[in-house]
Amino acid sequence: MARLLFRLLVESNTPSPAIDNSTAALNSDLVVILAALLCALICVLGLIAVSRCVWLRRLAAGNRTVSGSQTQSPQPPVAAANKGLKKKVLQSLPKLTFSPESPESEKFAECAICLAEFSAGDELRVLPQCGHGFHVACIDTWLGSHSSCPSCRQILVVARCHKCGGLPGSSSSGLESEPEIEIRIKQGEDDPNSFLP
């Protein structure tokens, strides 16, 4: 009789397999829920960091325009590159007729806008700030909505100073002039595919 009672007591204290499965399922559900909450927390923190960066940049840009002092860190006007040129300024840019025999033709191989090679008799417009050349129709369309070179993004028209009418960064005396450096590269010398037949 004592053995029977001992056996019943031991069996009642031993957990059944059904109870083990339910606790394991509960633990795995808890792990999935905690992982989802952790991912959500990381996403929220990332969005907060991005919005804070945007807010700080807007605040810094607002302070720069309000104070009016751009002598500390002169930066090129980014908004000016998206306006486009006036027709008067556009017509003042130099044009030339492409001739394969001319020494100037070495600089111009193809139009970076339409990707067509220049042929004899094509009219090209050369941008004075960077020296890049394009078909007249291509670059006129581009410059109708942009104020920068499509190849190097050099801004073509720099805003003049409202007080003195001079260009930014230029000295009023004109005594100090930086020497111009011209670098010429022979055709095929800097071509990464020059090893190909």
From Swiss-Prot:
| Origin superkingdom | Eukaryota
Q: What is its EC number?
A: 2.3.2.27
The pathway this protein participates in, as annotated, is: Protein modification; protein ubiquitination
Keyword Transmembrane on this protein?
Answer: yes
Kindly give the PROSITE patterns that the UniProt entry links to this protein: ZF_RING_2
Recorded hits in Pfam families, A to Z, give: zf-RING_2
One annotated GO biological process: cellular response to cold
Name it.
RING-H2 finger protein ATL80
Relay the domain remarks.
Answer: The RING-type zinc finger domain mediates binding to an E2 ubiquitin-conjugating enzyme.
Question: Which SUPFAM superfamilies does the record match to this protein?
Answer: RING/U-box
The record's Gene Ontology cellular component field reads: plasma membrane
Q: According to the record, what induces this protein's expression?
A: Up-regulated by chitin.
Coiled-coil region list: none
User: Which InterPro entries does the record associate with it?
Assistant: RING-type_E3_ligase_ATL, Znf_RING, Znf_RING/FYVE/PHD
Enzyme class, first EC level, given as a word: transferase
Query: Which organism encodes this protein?
Result: Arabidopsis thaliana
Query: Which family does the UniProt entry place this protein in?
Result: Belongs to the RING-type zinc finger family. ATL subfamily.
